[in-house]
Structures are given as structure tokens and as C-alpha cells.
From Swiss-Prot:
Gene Ontology MF terms in the entry: metal ion binding; phospholipase A2 activity
UniProt-listed GO biological process terms: lipid catabolic process
Catalytic activity: a 1,2-diacyl-sn-glycero-3-phosphocholine + H2O = a 1-acyl-sn-glycero-3-phosphocholine + a fatty acid + H(+)
Keywords in alphabetical order: Calcium, Disulfide bond, Hydrolase, Lipid degradation, Lipid metabolism, Metal-binding, Secreted
Organism: Naja naja (Indian cobra)
EC primary class: hydrolase
Protein name: Phospholipase A2 3
Length: 15
């Protein structure tokens, strides 16, 4: 679940 959460944030916040 944590992996998915991090992935969602990365998709929302393109570094």
C-alpha cells in the first residue's frame, strides 16, 4: 500500500 501511495504522490508531484 505504501508503494502505491508513494507512486500516487510522484504522479501528482513530478519532481
Amino acid at each position: 500500500n505504501l508503494y502505491q501511495f508513494k507512486n500516487m504522490i510522484q504522479c501528482t508531484v513530478p519532481s
